[in-house]
Amino acid sequence: MILFGYKNIFSTIGFHYPKHFQQEKESNKIRLLSWNVDDFLNSEKRFDSSNSPRRNILNFIKSVNADVMCFQDFSSYEENRLLASNIKYLVDTLKYNYYYFSVDDPYEKELYPRKYGTAIFSKYPIVDSGRFAYNWKHFPEHLMYATLNINHHPIRVYNTHLRSMMLHKFGRDSTEDYSFVQDDTTIIFHGHRYQKLLYYDSVHIQQAKLIKEQLNKSPLPFIFCADLNSVPSSYVYQRIRKDLNDAFIQNGTGWSGTYSELSPTLRIDVVLMSNELNSTQYYSPRIQNASDHYPIVTDIAIH
């Protein structure tokens, strides 16, 4: 029991002395950004002011100048006179010429169809990509991956978003589209928070089993980015993280929660990697008026 407690403490709290994040990156390292961007909140051009949430998100992405970016809750429209395309900005303006967008829901019934899912953007060529479906008929999320050619070193990057718990976004008066949660609307509308936690924990456990199975099969050194919707003390995190390096544990300080609501200590977003790779610095700034998640920026040594 004592050992179990220590395990949770060291997974939850970073014990490294605070260090200033070095903007200059060494040549044998890649800079990675992982972020649940919350659909960019609003892509309507009439709301795209200099301090709009979407603009704050894109400005931070630009400032980081990462080599590889993994996004959860990513969405994009086709560019038109009313709506901005997030993909177009990342490719044409920021020059991320290689990307793989795993579309989980195309939202084809909307007046202007919006594609939603997870995405990987890279300055390095993508030589292979694919995805594995979680077994939920009405909520078709995936574990996606892209194999990158990083200076002749093949590295596989995985990215995923585990099932949202709907703890506060879906109340009875919400005007959201419920079509994608048909299999568990009873829990969403009528379940108390504790019931939701129990239900979605069981969902996450099944998703974690598929993730760990695929990570164990990886033929290459890999990086795993995710919004786990589970904290480090959970079975889900402990199962996935087993035998892997955690960028936060290697370089993080304090609690460093990644979710801005409910509790400042909730570290539900992670960057993990196989033992051939190591994080050399970690940064998760509190970006205001942006996503409800905080970004993770880390430098990873490629041997």
Task: List each language-model region with its residue ranges.
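Metal-dependent phosphoester-hydrolase catalytic domains
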Residues: 1-12, 131, 202-223, 228-303
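Active-site beta-strand/loop signature of hydrolases that rely on acidic residues for catalysis
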Residues: 31-37, 56-83, 121, 146, ...
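Acidic/histidine-rich helix-loop elements
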Residues: 34-53, 75-79, 166-200
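A short, flexible N-terminal coil/short beta segment enriched in small residues
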Residues: 1-22, 167-170
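Beta-strand-turn-beta hairpins that frame and shape the catalytic cleft
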Residues: 23-33, 123-128, 139-183, 276-277, ...
